[in-house]
Amino acid sequence: KLLQADVRPDAVFAVSDTLAAGAMLAIASAGLKTPEDIAVVGFDGTALAEMVSPPLSTIEQPSQDIGRTAVGLLLNKIDNPDAPAQRVMMDWHYISRLSA
């Protein structure tokens, strides 16, 4: 419905590269072009972002570091059940490609 409306969105920011690729397919199916009509940005930084056409701009997150850190925090909590909760922040990177 949004793609057929008189006032369409300028851009889509998807919660994953997979959903962004689906949005690009829906945009093309509606006879519109990415990024000329609607820009698209994904999130994850997966290999899929380089395989779609046009290549997908994405927010790359350090997935392996997130996994390692989560396991370390879990093991620490198992060994020290009374340990306070920890908040961990990790860097991300915007990868500019042709979709936005």
PLM features: what roles do these ranges have?
Residues 4-100:
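Flexible loop/turn connectors
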Residues 1:
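A short, Lys/Arg-enriched amphipathic alpha-helix from helix-turn-helix/homeodomain DNA-binding modules
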